Curated annotation (Swiss-Prot):
One of its GO terms (biological process) is siderophore biosynthetic process. It catalyses: 2 N-(3-carboxypropanoyl)-N-hydroxyputrescine + 2 ATP = putrebactin + 2 AMP + 2 diphosphate + 2 H(+); 2 N-(3-carboxypropanoyl)-N-hydroxyputrescine + ATP = pre-putrebactin + AMP + diphosphate + H(+); pre-putrebactin + ATP = putrebactin + AMP + diphosphate + H(+). The gene is pubC. GO terms for molecular function: acid-amino acid ligase activity; ATP binding. It comes from Shewanella sp. (strain MR-4). It is an enzyme of class 6 (ligase). Homodimer. Its EC number is 6.3.2.63. InterPro entries: Aerobactin_biosyn_IucA/IucC_N, IucA/IucC-like_C, LucA/IucC-like. This is Putrebactin synthase. Pathway: Siderophore biosynthesis.
Length: 629
């Protein structure tokens, strides 16, 4: 083609023929990427880096002045020095005053920059050149997320304390309290973020597909079959989907129906499973009539249209906080059976019911087997976890009409004015802070202790995995979720049924107690104590005494477990300092190998146990029970 003689191709366009920014479906620059939000996001993340890397002994800031319980620190790096003020709490926790942080270079203060700080620390972090760029991208994405929350989530703690369940869920701003890069979401673009990030609180529709039964695993609780479940979840759409298959000349009874994350369908399934789609083994059916809201875990959905219906959890092949967030078809094959076994155990022991501890069961699961990847890959791989889903009970049937729900992550939430939701919730309840905390510990800590000591059973008890049931702000029940992937039986003395063998975990005996001391004390209570100390009348010392009281009372009620209490001593002087950020820094593609949970763990010496101070008065055999007030 001769462009010089083809005038039509050279005809200039007028400005009116070009799309304008206003006409675009999405803005080219997100509104939250403004200097004030970006600076605030960096200050927040620099504060967290200084806190958590000090806790994990990656850095060692030095005290240069002390005054009235506040220490003034400096961290000298190669070409700059960071200065900040903080209170030192138990478990080597620095509660840093965000406004006190400054960085000086060549005698001049510089803007706080989380990316710059990570790069300056890269030798101390010990990351490979291969992994570092991905980690930096995760840091940037975490800053992006924080800036969004600063711009769009200005709900005061006092308002959130009385808000509905899904408003609170979307109002959480921190994510995992320990991890620095906790909002990576590698794979989402700007528009995906607006649609699929939990903090966007978007109402969205799931994609539904039909998958051929002979290539798919479906499992469910006894007495529940695929058609019964899907008729309940889909309503009239179930019949419409069957009619659609018939119109295509397909036998409806040769297929299961499966929900898929819209991003997963667009970015992964439509391409990676193209052969299956072309052969008619996977058939697109349409979008759900019901609307859903993404939960904090980013791949779980709450049904907004019919809240009594199930949560839906789907595979989502984005990299987020050390894992590709897929779901294994192999795991789906026994997930309901594991849930049934755990629920039967919990429900058969009256102690759990007395404490108000309830399991939200995953009642059914489905997984499509991509034969090529399963044949080609012998090791665990994200490519074998792209197309699965499960259904989990809604929390609504477990509460009374006057009761409300709140993610336990909310207890660590602090609003943009540094006001804690926990303090607002306690005030709303009308209870004293001490009484509120006692009731909370009875609901949360006591059942976890009983599961550990009586059954060698552990959960993943971080805030996002638990739902508080509140009555006028008073905690009355607690709901535990994410059972199939997160529960384990540690060095169990009794053989497990074949269908739940996956729960059995063998590990060094000295590491077993870490499931209490790390997961609860270090990852939850380390943050809870300073909030109570600063914003309620419960001091840090009083909080740890309440924890010690709870342990003492539990052990006194179960003297038959005395040997276990001695073997796994909750009042011992110290425990191993397990470093979660170091684990992510070591391998941010897959932090933990589920086949060998200890292999990737990273440690940094010991850490003093706050309960050691109560050994003489509270350890089993020494207890003197306080009269109930």
């Amino acid at each position: 083609m001769n462009l010089a003689t083809n005038r039509a191709l050279l005809k200039p366009f007028t400005q009116a023929e070009f799309p304008t920014l206003e006409a675009a479906a999405h803005p080219h620059v997100p509104a939250h990427l403004m200097p004030e939000y970006w600076q605030a996001a960096n200050r927040h993340l620099v504060k967290k880096i200084l806190c958590e890397f000090t806790h994990e002994k990656i850095i060692s800031p030095q005290i240069y002045r002390q005054a009235a319980g506040i220490n003034h620190y400096e961290l000298r790096l190669k070409d700059c020095t960071y200065y900040f003020s903080a209170r030192h709490y138990q478990l080597d926790h620095l509660e840093i005053e965000a406004g006190s942080i400054r960085v000086s270079s060549a005698g001049q203060d510089k803007p706080l920059d989380a990316m710059s700080l990570i790069i300056k620390l890269k030798d101390a972090l010990g990351m490979s050149e291969t992994l570092l760029p991905t980690y930096l991208e995760e840091i940037t994405s975490t800053l992006y997320s924080k800036a969004y929350k600063l711009a769009h989530q200005a709900i005061p703690a006092t308002t959130l304390a009385k808000a509905d369940y899904q408003t609170i869920e979307a109002g959480m701003t921190e994510g995992h309290p320990v991890f620095i890069a906790n909002n990576g979401r590698i794979g989402f673009d700007m528009q995906d973020y607006d649609q699929f990030a939990p903090e966007s609180a978007s109402a969205l529709q799931l994609v539904w597909i039909a998958v051929r039964k002979d290539k798919t695993t479906f499992s469910s609780l006894e007495g529940l079959d695929h058609d019964s479940l899907l008729k309940q979840e889909l309503g009239e759409q179930f019949t419409k989907f069957q009619q659609h298959l018939s119109a295509l000349g397909q036998a409806a009874d040769s297929f299961y129906f499966m929900p898929v994350h819209p991003w997963q369908w667009r970015e992964k399934i439509a391409r990676t499973f193209a052969g299956e789609i072309a052969r008619g083994d996977i058939i697109y059916l349409g979008e759900s009539q019901d609307c859903y809201q993404v939960q904090q875990s980013i791949r779980t959905f709450f049904n907004l249209s019919a809240p009594q219906k199930c949560y839906v959890k789907t595979a989502l092949s984005i990299l987020n906080m050390g894992f590709m967030r897929g779901l294994s078809p192999l795991y789906m094959s026994c997930t309901p059976q594991i849930n049934a076994w755990v629920a039967d155990l919990i429900e058969s022991d009256s102690y759990f019911a007395e404490q108000g501890f309830v399991i939200l069961k995953e009642i059914a699961a489905i997984g499509y087997h991509h034969r090529y990847y399963e044949e080609a890959l012998t090791q665990d791989s994200a490519y074998k976890k792209m197309l699965s889903a499960l259904w989990r009970e809604s929390p609504l049937p477990h509460i009374e009409p006057q009761q409300t729900l709140m993610t336990m992550a909310a207890l660590l939430h602090v609003d943009h004015q540094e006001q804690a939701l926990l303090a607002a919730l306690i005030k709303h309840s009308g209870l004293s802070a001490k009484e509120w905390v006692k009731r909370y510990l009875n609901l949360y800590l006591s059942p976890l202790l009983h599961a550990f000591f009586a059954y060698d059973l552990v959960f993943m008890p971080h805030g996002e995995n638990l739902i508080l049931v509140l009555d006028a702000g008073i905690p009355v029940k607690i709901l535990m979720k994410d059972i199939g992937e997160e529960v384990a039986v540690l060095n169990g003395s009794e053989p497990l049924p074949q269908e739940v063998q996956r729960l059995a975990v063998e590990l060094e005996e000295e590491m077993k107690l870490n499931y209490i001391l790390l997961d609860i004390f270090d990852c939850i209570f380390r943050y809870l104590a300073p909030i109570l100390d600063k914003q309620t009348e419960v001091s840090e010392a009083q909080f740890w005494e309440l924890v010690a009281d709870n342990v003492r009372d539990y052990q006194a009620q179960h003297p038959q477990l005395a040997d276990k209490f001695a073997q796994y001593d909750l009042f011992k002087d110290s425990f191993v300092r397990t470093c979660l950020n170091r684990i992510q820094l070591n391998n941010n593609q897959q932090m933990i190998d589920l086949a060998d949970r200890e292999k990737n763990l990273r440690f940094a010496g010991g850490i003093d146990n706050p309960l050691a101070a109560f050994r003489q008065s509270h350890a089993f055999g020494n207890q003197k029970l306080k009269p109930k007030s």
